[in-house]
């Protein structure tokens, strides 16, 4: 549905369009004519139809496009969809030259041509079409003059008919004149303004002669009349009488002729004129109308009207006839005489073109040529001629004249060369790319001849040896006067061989003599962008120093292009990966650096440089640019740490690695080659330049010095050189090379424990020290022997010996507890000491206790000494004594017991002279000299002597007041006890080495750049120990070790009868 700008005009518009239905919607084997309907005077962008849909072409991919080759003055087409619509210029049917003399609705049309173009113009089809322009009611019918004058003789009989001037309407058909109306003048008497109409339904056949007498009605025609009342208050009793009536007749040429009929008597003496209103109305919707004053003058009698010999005159006229050439003579006769019989000829309802081209002699009726007539402009003239006498009033007759303009071969063929598809063509020059395919249409050639028949039959050809040929644009046989051809390429084009062709096209018609014409087209072969820019090298490598100034040129890359013009103009660009770092001049190819390069951050840049030409399509080439950033000595050497801390074990062999420092230089080459030095070198350490490993030149003694601190300097090889320093702290770690030393109790001392002591009574406290540090000095106490009754236990940490069992009669006597003290080193070192406990109420015989302690020093540690061994025997003897009442038996028994006791005691004394090398039934603990460690040599100045670490030390005074040397005095000569091992002991002699020596060796210490700092003392890496000091308690200190020596028995007469021991006794109770 079309939208009109005004409501009234829209109704006529819509009825005139009915909209835009194509008359041909399919394409059969041959191309058909596309026909559409369109109402005139429509706005822009009114849809007419879809060419693609009507041709059955699928659109949407963009590969097939449409182009309007002709008709673009009023029409336009969408290149992709094929939608045909109106352009900005309005279509006025009445102003179209081809519709001036057209009275058939289907004969007024606009021609157009549409080309359908395949992909890359590989094929082109041309289709013709017509848009039939439908008339709308846009013109108002008008009379020749606003006042029409008609002369009527008085006393004319009723029924006399007079022809009235006709109105003209530029529209036709139903929009043309439909009816005439006669309106009574207001105030003129009669019917007081009443109107009567004579229209299409009121019309009658046009009378043959059209006369104006009583018989003017002619024959065979029915009439509808409109009365005009005579006023003036005459004899008409009603004041009104009918005088005139309007009748409309249909003429042979299809027009409507208004006629005035006399209905009443006319008396000039009573009234000499009448003024009526004649209205004309067309058949449009809404209708248009206009009116004129019809002035009727009553005159004397003119009896007869002129009459033409024919109602229709038809003649042929050759075009281009010279002005003045007679065509035909119109003849009419009038029976009147005198002035009433004199006839003059005038044009009737004729168009302006008729009056411009023809001349009608008013007296003779000769029709002649006024101006040359061109058949190509007007092929037929149809008009009316009026014959009018000179009577008062004059009478008229009308005849139709039809002139057929005959053709002459007066037009040379016309050659029009237009663009087709996407090939540009302007001012007779077509630009064709060299890579077009053979048989590609490059232009549309239309050859036409305005002549008719053989004069308009045209043939066309291409002149000369050019790679082009003409092919018909349509497969159908169309109008021979108008032919269309495609100008195709016949061979490949080569820009390098020929860059321009002058194509001459000649057209010849078939007239006699024939006429010909020619037209030319310059075809310029365009260079195709078929060569990409090329670089001389696929990889360009440059070296550029760091710390540059932004904006410096790094390198220049150049590319060449074998094409020409825009196709050879090159623009350079860089990868987006280095945008901001580098830039390139798009014209010169100079690569510039935008920032300061730092080789230590990025030492190499690799990117692509693209060279693009400016052709269509754009082609490009590329090369890889590698920028190696050259180093400058702008970085100091850098140690991984400002302070390196290492831990090494004491007694490490000289020239052993003690640590490793790591230093780096962000520079490169000689700037990164470094030399390492130890500042303030005291010849204790050296450093390896390549690895940074630090070596010691001596063996470390933790007891001598625990830490070493020095500085390491690194100097690079730059010019000038750069340097850096770091501090190295070396901590000497302790080795478990000292066994625990027991300070209390002494081996010869004992503790008196009353039998009434309660459980958890503290019996004694074992105190020991260790010269080592850390976990090597963590001591653990344990009872390893002499506790068969489980009466005692020792706190493993504090060394406190407590009573844990109830003492009974059988527990009376001496108890020898073997206590072992172990450190926590790896491997562990240990020492063994003796704790003597005498269970009794009091010490009644100190000598006997001293004797028992002395004997216990020679008894193997595997043999328990706990309580009175003769307790059971004494109990039996007591039973015998109780049983024997007799005195003699008692005396005898006592004597025997005393004798046996003395005998046994004497025997035992001889047995305690152990210590001689030839007696191997038992052994005592002996400390072994540690001669392996050089640092302990100063402690071993005395000769090696057996040390009784497994016996009780008893302090006694010599008779002269000096302190008796005990067996344990030998221990002061050696700092630690050796490992226990069996020396040909007798049966039952213990192997203390098997029971008490440590097993696993120290783990291997790996050197690292920095030794880890130990946490707790039981970690794998020990904390640095304090100074290794040995704690002693005078000459009689018992020092034990986990190293066990051979047992040797040396009494040196220390336990002879002449000697009396005065032991220290601790008494509980």
UniProtKB/Swiss-Prot annotation:
Cytoplasmic side: 901-1069
Glycosylation sites recorded in the entry for this protein: 79, 689, 747, 780, 822, 840, 845
Domain Cadherin: 29-143, 144-308, 309-415, 424-535, 536-639, 640-742, 745-862
SUPFAM superfamilies in the cross-refs: Cadherin-like
Annotated membrane topology: Single-pass type I membrane protein
GO molecular function, one term: calcium ion binding
Ranges for region Disordered: 182-242, 910-988
Membrane topology (Extracellular): 29-879
Annotated positions of the Phosphoserine modification: 989, 1011
Keyword Transmembrane helix: yes
Bias kind Basic residues: ranges: 930-944
Keywords: Calcium, Cell adhesion, Cell membrane, Glycoprotein, Membrane, Phosphoprotein, Repeat, Signal, Transmembrane, Transmembrane helix
Keyword Calcium tagged: yes
Signal peptide interval: 1-28
Pfam families: Cadherin, Cadherin_2, Protocadherin
Gene Ontology CC: plasma membrane; platelet alpha granule membrane
Transmembrane region(s): 880-900
CDD domains per record: Cadherin_repeat (cd11304)
Tissue: Expressed predominantly in brain and heart and at lower levels in various other tissues.
Name of the protein this chain belongs to: Protocadherin-7
């Amino acid at each position: 549905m079309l939208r009109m700008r005004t409501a009234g005009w829209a109704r006529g518009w819509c009825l005139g369009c009915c909209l835009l239905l194509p008359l041909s919607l399919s394409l059969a084997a041959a191309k058909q004519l596309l026909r559409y309907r369109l109402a005139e005077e429509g706005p822009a962008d009114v849809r007419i139809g879809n060419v693609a849909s009507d041709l059955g072409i699928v659109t949407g991919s963009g590969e097939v496009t449409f182009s309007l080759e002709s008709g673009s003055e009023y029409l336009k087409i969408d290149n992709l969809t094929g939608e045909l619509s109106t352009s900005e210029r309005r279509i006025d049917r009445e102003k179209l030259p081809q519709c001036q003399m057209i009275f058939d609705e289907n004969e007024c049309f606009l021609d157009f041509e549409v080309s359908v173009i395949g992909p890359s113009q590989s094929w082109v089809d041309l289709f013709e079409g017509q848009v039939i322009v439908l008339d709308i009611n846009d013109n108002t019918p008008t009379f020749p003059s606003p006042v029409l004058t008609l002369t009527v003789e008085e006393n004319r009989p009723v029924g006399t008919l007079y022809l009235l001037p006709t109105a003209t309407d530029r529209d036709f058909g139903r929009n043309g004149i439909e009816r005439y109306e006669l309106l009574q003048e207001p105030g003129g008497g009669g019917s007081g303004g009443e109107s009567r109409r004579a229209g299409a339904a009121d019309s009658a056949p046009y009378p043959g002669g059209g006369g104006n007498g009583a018989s003017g009605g002619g024959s065979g025609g029915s009439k509808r009349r409109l009365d005009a009342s005579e006023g003036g208050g005459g004899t008409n009793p009603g004041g009104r009488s009918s005088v005139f009536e309007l009748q409309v007749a249909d003429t042979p040429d299809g027009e409507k002729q208004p006629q005035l009929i006399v209905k009443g008597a006319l008396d000039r003496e009573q009234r000499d004129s009448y003024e009526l209103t004649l209205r004309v109305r067309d058949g449009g919707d809404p209708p248009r109308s206009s009116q004129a004053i019809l002035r009727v003058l009553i005159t004397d009698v003119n009896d007869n009207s002129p009459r033409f010999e024919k109602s229709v005159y038809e003649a042929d006229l050759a075009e281009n006839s010279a002005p003045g050439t007679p065509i035909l003579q119109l003849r009419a006769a009038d029976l009147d005489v005198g002035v009433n019989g004199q006839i003059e000829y005038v044009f009737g309802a004729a168009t302006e073109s008729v009056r411009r081209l023809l001349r009608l002699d008013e007296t003779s009726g000769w029709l002649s040529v006024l101006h040359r007539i061109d058949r190509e402009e007007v092929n037929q003239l149809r008009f009316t001629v009026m014959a009018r006498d000179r009577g008062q009033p004059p009478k008229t007759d009308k005849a139709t004249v039809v002139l057929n303009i005959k053709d002459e071969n007066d037009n040379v063929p016309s050659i029009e060369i237009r663009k087709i598809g996407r090939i540009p063509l302007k001012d007779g020059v077509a630009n064709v790319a060299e890579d077009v395919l053979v048989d590609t249409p490059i232009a549309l050639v239309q050859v036409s001849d305005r002549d008719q028949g053989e004069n308009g039959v045209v043939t066309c050809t291409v002149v000369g040896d050019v790679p082009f040929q003409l092919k018909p644009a349509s497969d159908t046989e169309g109008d021979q006067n108008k032919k269309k051809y495609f100008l195709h390429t016949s061979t490949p084009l080569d820009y390098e061989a020929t860059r321009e062709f002058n194509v001459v096209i000649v057209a010849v018609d078939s007239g006699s003599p024939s006429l010909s014409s020619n037209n030319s087209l310059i075809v310029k072969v365009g260079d195709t962008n078929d060569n990409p820019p090329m670089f001389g090298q696929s990889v360009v490598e440059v070296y550029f120093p760091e710390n540059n100034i932004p904006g410096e040129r790094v390198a220049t890359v150049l590319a060449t292009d074998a094409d020409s013009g825009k196709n050879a103009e090159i623009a350079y660009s860089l990868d987006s990966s280095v945008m901001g770092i580098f830039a390139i001049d798009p014209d010169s190819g100079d690569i510039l650096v935008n920032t300061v390069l730092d080789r230590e951050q990025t030492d190499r840049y690799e990117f692509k440089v693209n060279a693009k030409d400016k052709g269509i399509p754009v082609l490009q080439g590329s090369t890889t640019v590698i920028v190696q950033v050259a180093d400058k000595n702008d970085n100091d050497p850098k140690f991984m740490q400002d302070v390196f801390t290492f831990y090494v074990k004491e007694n490490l062999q000289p020239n052993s690695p003690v640590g490793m420092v790591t230093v780096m230089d962000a520079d490169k080459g000689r700037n990164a080659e470094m030399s390492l030095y130890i500042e303030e070198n005291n010849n204790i350490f050296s450093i390896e330049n390549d690895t940074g490993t630090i070596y010691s030149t001596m063996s470390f003694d933790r007891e001598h010095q625990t830490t070493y601190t020095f500085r390491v300097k690194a100097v690079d090889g730059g010019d000038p050189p750069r340097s850096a320093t770091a501090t190295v702290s070396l901590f000497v770690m302790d080795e478990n090379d000292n066994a625990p030393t027991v300070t209390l109790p002494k081996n010869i001392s004992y503790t008196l424990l009353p039998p009434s002591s309660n459980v958890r009574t503290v019996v004694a406290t074992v105190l020991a020290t260790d010269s080592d540090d850390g976990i090597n000095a963590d001591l653990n106490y344990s009872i390893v022997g002499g506790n068969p009754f489980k009466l005692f236990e020792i706190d493993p940490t504090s060394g406190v010996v407590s009573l844990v069992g109830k003492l009974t009669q059988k527990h009376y006597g001496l108890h020898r507890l073997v206590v072992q003290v172990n450190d926590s080193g790896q491997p562990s070192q240990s020492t063994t000491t003796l704790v003597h406990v005498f269970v009794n109420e009091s010490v009644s015989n100190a000598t006997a206790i001293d004797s028992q302690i002395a004997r216990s020093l020679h008894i193997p540690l595997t043999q328990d000494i706990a309580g009175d061994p003769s307790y059971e025997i004494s109990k039996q003897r007591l039973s015998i004594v109780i049983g024997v009442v007799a005195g003699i038996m008692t005396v005898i028994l006592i004597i025997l017991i005393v004798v046996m006791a003395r005998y046994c005691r004497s025997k035992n004394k001889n047995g305690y002279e152990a210590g001689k090398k030839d007696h191997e039934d038992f052994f005592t603990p002996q400390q072994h000299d540690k001669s392996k460690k050089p640092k302990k040599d100063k402690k071993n100045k005395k000769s090696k002597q057996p040390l009784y670490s497994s016996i009780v030390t008893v302090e006694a005074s010599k008779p002269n007041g000096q302190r008796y040397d005990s067996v344990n005095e030998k221990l002061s000569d050696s700092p630690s006890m050796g490992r226990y091992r069996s020396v040909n002991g007798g049966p039952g002699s213990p192997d203390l080495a098997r029971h008490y020596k440590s097993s696993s060796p120290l783990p291997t210490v790996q050197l690292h750049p920095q030794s880890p700092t130990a946490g707790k003392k039981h970690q794998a890496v020990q904390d640095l120990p304090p100074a290794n000091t040995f704690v002693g308690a005078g000459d009689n200190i018992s020092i034990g070790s986990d190293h066990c020596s051979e047992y040797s028995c040396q009494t040196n007469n220390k336990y002879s009868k002449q000697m009396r021991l005065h032991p220290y006794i601790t008494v509980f109770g």
